[in-house]
Amino acid sequence: MAAPRSCVLWSYCGHGWSRLAGDCRLPGFRRSWLGATLSARSLSQEKRAAETHFGFETVSEKEKGGKVYQVFQSVARKYDLMNDMMSLGIHRAWKDLLIRKMHPLPGTQLLDVAGGTGDIAFRFLSYVQTQHERKQRRQLRTRQNLSWEEIARKYQSKEDPLGGSLVMVCDINREMLKVGKQKALARGHTAGLAWVLGDAEELPFDDDRFDVYTIAFGIRNVTHIDRALQEAHRVLKPGGRFLCLEFSQVNDPLISRLYDLYSFQVIPVIGEVIAGDWKSYQYLVESIRKFPNQEEFKDMIEDAGFQKVTYESLTSGIVAIHSGFKL
């Protein structure tokens, strides 16, 4: 999610390899010593260039960032419950598939952007821990000459259960991160996990830092999607992988009509009943319809420098997983 640059306050905890963001200008704002000599026509053109959409509403780029921030601040506490209610739980299967496609091995360094409540991060940690345990068992089986005492000591040793894996959860919204941290404590996730307040359009990390970049149901809320994609490319190591799970375009006419009916007539009502917030869920539905289709988004990913870009549509195209590599 993007917000006005003037609202961004970088924060970091857990490791010392990130950098703080410096002063930023507002998106679309241009200083000029010509000042008053700018013509009315050029001012009008600049104003149009700085316009974007907030759902079906046309707003300034500066205004969109603040509006999106307020949406997720409002829904943070009920965000996970609403995901279950709106998707009838299917979002869990989509996220599980994203992790299986990633197939992270022990030692993988993951950046999960717009991942505030931790759904992707927790799945990643569970997956790599399972992979690490399997690796350990294979190693023990190949060392037939170990005594039972040596085997017991190895299992009881306090080595990293994740095999050196790390997931950084980066989100621009403090409330979403707060919910994620509370969930992590409740589930006992402490090792290999850190939380960062940051903007997808200007990530507070060094170049060539991560093995994998994920963003699930977040990139459509970014003001400048192209900038977020360029940042994803920058922070990935050579050979690193970009994975995006996002709502997309339904490819069946009948299902599309039913989906529209459910989206516009049912989801805002659920939002009002469960979260007491009709408008936020009306925006979320509208933002899905404004997002590029599968092929258009694939082109945007390629324009950012990624190669071998592919996508897989799920549930008749309601969502899609896009994948690309930094080569």
From Swiss-Prot:
Binding annotation for S-adenosyl-L-methionine: 117, 171, 199-200
Q: Where in the cell is it found?
A: Mitochondrion inner membrane
Q: How does it sit in the membrane?
A: Peripheral membrane protein
What's in the keyword line of the UniProt record? Membrane, Methyltransferase, Mitochondrion, Mitochondrion inner membrane, S-adenosyl-L-methionine, Transferase, Transit peptide, Ubiquinone biosynthesis
Q: Known catalysed reaction(s)?
A: 2-methoxy-6-(all-trans-decaprenyl)benzene-1,4-diol + S-adenosyl-L-methionine = 5-methoxy-2-methyl-3-(all-trans-decaprenyl)benzene-1,4-diol + S-adenosyl-L-homocysteine + H(+)
Query: Which Pfam family is one of this chain's hits?
Result: Ubie_methyltran
GO cellular component terms, A-Z? extrinsic component of mitochondrial inner membrane; mitochondrial inner membrane; mitochondrial matrix; protein-containing complex; ubiquinone biosynthesis complex
Specify the transit peptide boundaries: 1-49
GO molecular function ontology, one term from the record: 2-methoxy-6-polyprenyl-1,4-benzoquinol methyltransferase activity
Which biological pathway? Cofactor biosynthesis; ubiquinone biosynthesis
Q: What is its EC number?
A: 2.1.1.201
Instruction: State if Transferase is listed as a keyword.
Output: yes
Q: Supply the PANTHER family for this chain.
A: 2-METHOXY-6-POLYPRENYL-1,4-BENZOQUINOL METHYLASE, MITOCHONDRIAL (PTHR43591:SF24), METHYLTRANSFERASE (PTHR43591)
Q: Tell me the subunit arrangement.
A: Component of a multi-subunit COQ enzyme complex, composed of at least COQ3, COQ4, COQ5, COQ6, COQ7 and COQ9. Interacts with PYURF; the interaction is direct, stabilizes COQ5 protein and associates PYURF with COQ enzyme complex.
Q: Which HAMAP family match?
A: MenG_UbiE_methyltr
Q: What protein family is recorded? A: Belongs to the class I-like SAM-binding methyltransferase superfamily. MenG/UbiE family.
Task performed by this protein: Methyltransferase required for the conversion of 2-decaprenyl-6-methoxy-1,4-benzoquinol (DDMQH2) to 2-decaprenyl-3-methyl-6-methoxy-1,4-benzoquinol (DMQH2).
Its protein name is 2-methoxy-6-polyprenyl-1,4-benzoquinol methylase, mitochondrial
